[in-house]
Every structure is written in C-alpha cells, then in structure tokens.
Amino acid sequence: MASPVNRTVIISGDSASTIETVTARSELGSTAAGTPDTSPPTSRSRSPDEPKASTSTDASTVPLEPMEVKNICFVGAGFVGGPTAALIAFHNPHIQVTVVDLNAERVAAWNSPHLPIHETGLPKIVRIARDGTNETTAFLPTINKTIKVAPRTPNLTFSTDLENGIGAADIVLICVNTPTKTYGIGAGMTADLSAVEGASETVAKYAKNGAVVVEKSTVPTGTARMIREILAQYRPRCEFEVVSNPEFLAEGTAVRDLMNPDRILIGSNTTPAGLRAAAALKGVYAGWVPESKILTVNTWSSELTKLVANAMLAQRISSINSISAMCEELGADVQEISRGIGADSRLGKKFLHAGVGFGGSCFEKDILNLSYMARVLHLDTVADYWMGVLDINKYQRQRFAEKVHRALNGNLRGKKVAIFGFAFKEGTNDTRNSIAVHIIRQLANERPREIAIFDPGCSPEEILSEVGQHIQDEPTLAQVKVRTNWRETTDGASAICILTPWYHFHYPKQAQATARRTSLWNGSKEQQLADANTGFLGPHPTEMDLIELENCVTRGKNKVPLDPLKRLKPEACPENCKGCNTSSTNAEGGGDPVDWEEVSAMMKLPKLVLDGRNVVSAPELEKLGFKVQGIGKGVGM
C-alpha cells in the first residue's frame, strides 16, 4: 500500500511562518491512516481543510435546497466593488444590491453624477439601477409598431451604513484592497491582508446566520481559511459558507468585461453546504452570463487562478518587450513580429503590444505575491522565474528614460519635456503605480525646466496626488506641472513622451472604436412584427433586450444619444457639489485629439517624440518636422 503524501499548503501570505502541512490522499486511494479511502469521488478536487462528505453519498449529488437570494451587499466601493455591484444590480432587478464603504466622500460620489471611477458605459448603468427608469415607448419604423417599455424601480444603493447593509444580505462580497505589504515579514512581496481581515470581522459582527461570504479581492491562496476562522471566532453558533469569486475585469474595459465575461470562476468547498453556496452565487450571474462560462472549482484553485492569470498576462508583455530591445539593435520592427507570432492560433494576438512596460495596481502586486508563495514553499526556481517578469518590466522603463536622456544630448537642464498620458492604461483614471510616474521620477532627477503632464482621463488632482507619493523633494516636485490640454503641455517643449495610448495621441488620427451592433431586432419585418406582437420578447424583457432595442432604434444614425429610449431619470447635484467644482476629464475621451501640425509649430528643436506605445507613424510625423523614436524599431521606422 502506498504511503501518504505530505504537501504544504499556503494558509496566509502574511508571513513565512503561517504554513500548515497536511496529509493528502495518494494516487492509489489511501487515507492518511493507511486504510482504504472510501470517500466518494466528486467532480472537482477538495480544498485541503474542508470537511469530508459522507462516505455513503457523493456530495456533488446530494439534493440541495435552493437558496433564494433577495439581497446582496458589497463591502468596498472601489474599482472592483462599485462596477461589479452596478452590473449585478443592472441585470438582476429583483435583487436589492447595497454597496457599503466607510469612505463617506466616495459613497457621496457614487450617489452623484460624478462617479469616483471613470469607466466607459458605467454612468448609464449606475443611473438605471440606482435611480430607476421611466416608463417609455420605442417606435420601430420598419414595422410601424410602437413598443412599450415598463418603468424600473431602483435596486442599487450606496451607503456608509455597514450594519444594515451587511445585516440584510443573503450574500456578502468582500471587495477591499490587498496592496503589497510594506512592513515586517514579507515586506515588498506578499499581500497586506489587514483590510480583508478588518472587513471579515465587520461581516462577522453584522451578517445574518446562513449568509454566504464571498472573497472578491485578490488574495494569497488559503485566505478563505482565515476568513472562515474569523467568522467562527465572532459567531461560533452561526453557519457561514466562504466562497472565492475572483474578479477578472480589466480597468478601462470593466463594463464590457462584466457584460460579456470570458468566464466567471466560483470556488467553494465540495460539501453540500459549499455547493449550495456556490449555486446561489452562480444563480446571480446566470441573470446574464451563459452557464457554460460559469466555472466551479475548489476554493484554493479559485484563489490561485487569479494570481496565475495576471502573472501570465504580464509575462506576455515582458516577453515581447524583451524582444523589442533586440529589434532596436537588429533593425527589425517589433510590431511586425507581434503580427507574425500573433497570427499563430496557439499564441493569439492579445498582450503582444510592445511598449514602455506595464503598470497599475494588479500585475506587479500579484506576481510579487505568487513569487513569495513559491519562495515560502522552497520553490526558489519558480520564484526566480516569475521575478524575471518584473525585472524585464523595470528594465524596459529604465531603458526608455535613458533613451529620452540620450536623445536630448544627455542634458535636460533648461528644457521642457511634455508627458502625454499618466493613467496606467487608456480608458481609466486609475493612476496607481503608473509607468508614467516612474519615468517622470527619473527625468526629474535631471533637473529639467519643466515636466508638463496631460492625460485626457485624469484630473490634475489625481495626477499630483500620485506624483507626490513618489517625489517628496519640493524643488524637484516644483518642476512637475499638470496641464488640462495638449496645447499648454507642448508649448515650448523640446520632447514629448507618449506613455498612455489614448486615441487622442494617435497619428494618423484613429477613430474611436465602435462596437459592432447585433440585435434580435435585426431580422425581417415579419419577424420584428411577430416579436413586437408578443409583448417585446415576452412579459419581462431583460436589460440585454433593451440594449438590443436601443441598437435597433438608433441604427443608421451618425450620433447616438446617451438615452435613445428616454428611460433615464434626471440627475441633480446638491448645492456646493464638490464634483462640480473639481476639474476633471473623463475616461471616455475628454478633450480634442492632438493636432500634431499645430504642436510642431509650438515646440522647440529638436522636436523629439519618444513614442512609448507605438501609436504614431514615424514617417508621417517626420514630414511635420518631428524626430521620432518608437519602441522596438529603429529611428524613423
């Protein structure tokens, strides 16, 4: 008989000492005690610490009493909690969704026209769910038929009342920050779980017995156990199930990603209670996500999948960036290489765009976390492998700053450098750990006359706040100026650095992408009339049906209004609204596109354009008098 296999499982990423060794079943089916394993097979592997199901019945086939979900609460109104709550409320009008946060200013912003997060399409979705809609009609001229659209009652609330918000919920989702730890054991590597711990304690105090607690935050593998233990400590007589449901949305395209996700991942125990909890959460997403895209796994697999997904996306970026350095020496064009390898169906074309590197709050943090877990498990080769992804990223941004220095003859004194783009990617106002701030810090050390920054999606306050965290020296910080338009930014500049690929900066100009419209209403007149006569696809049209109806009534129009069906209720700001008094742009493209011919007339020689995102055509810009250097290509390419 095979001997038991010992394996180590990460319980928490907070310290190297929090490791527990458990005995796993061998491949031959023996238990730790050496007796035959009679536990039933299940459709997925167990989490290491979950209780085993009865040996007489397969846990995955136990009849489960469905859990009715009437109320959901999100703890945390940030980049994950706010948009996810809005989309769930939008697609589930029968469920009351509450988002609670201790930050009163953030909650007030969610309850105003000035949302704290800039995501394309999000304001309209929030308004529909938060404020409700008017009864309206839509006329379809092709069939000469008027469709009646019923009003909708509000079902999305933002509040600072944690006790009532959590207490009423059938499902509570924890959506708080898990930044890299800055102190003690694991500093600079593992995740700081203090916010998750605090949120779990709050949930334990107020949640009703039987509530499902969902970890939505990105966490080290094994964090669900910590949450489970906190719940048991505070409420030992209550029964809670902890489920993992990591988010896979990308900032800048969050609404699109939530509307049509590649997958929804739900991790739970394989006990009857765990499966029941997973089924309840699955039912919420089933309001608009096909069942084939909702994957159920064990808790630890779910937690680890999120880290691995981000690490592998970052790995692709670093891989192509490493090749870009070779291209510049060999005379090859990295964009042509990207097209060549991206055409291989085994590789695909996504995340193969060479640039100045990746930033943001996720990729670097999650790779550090993954590497730290490997190090704790004594898998040093694995840890070093993933750290190499970050080494290339740091090398790429340092290489870019050095390129700017060389292009200006090794001297920035008395010169103005313009920065186009500060957000870590286009389509968002998130400035956390942006590539731009690292480049600016290096350039500021060269004592230029001015570093002028313009980003069409960020307010000056947001940019200065992030810069101030990285540059504390007052004389150096005084060199940095944030401008609200590209004209002020480039006037008198010797060089422009393009660091975020907003469409505003492209040359030749690139039209904003528009989604290809498809609709159930695109059929023949007879089919449309039949659909209309049935009462608009049945008595209870979904929001997806209404989106399709909007597409139908606006087809052929050059300019599509925000609210073609006139469903939205008017928004009003309170007196002395802080949002109205704050200068900001928006992530859908505030400001006009850059007129490069006008820029050329305003700049000083040598009129350098350092294109860190390969969004301009060097030959075309050079016709206007610029000298252009891109990423992964020779001068003038």
Question: What residue spans do the PLM features occupy?
Answer:
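Structural/interface elements that position substrates and couple domains in central-metabolism enzymes
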Residues: 2-637
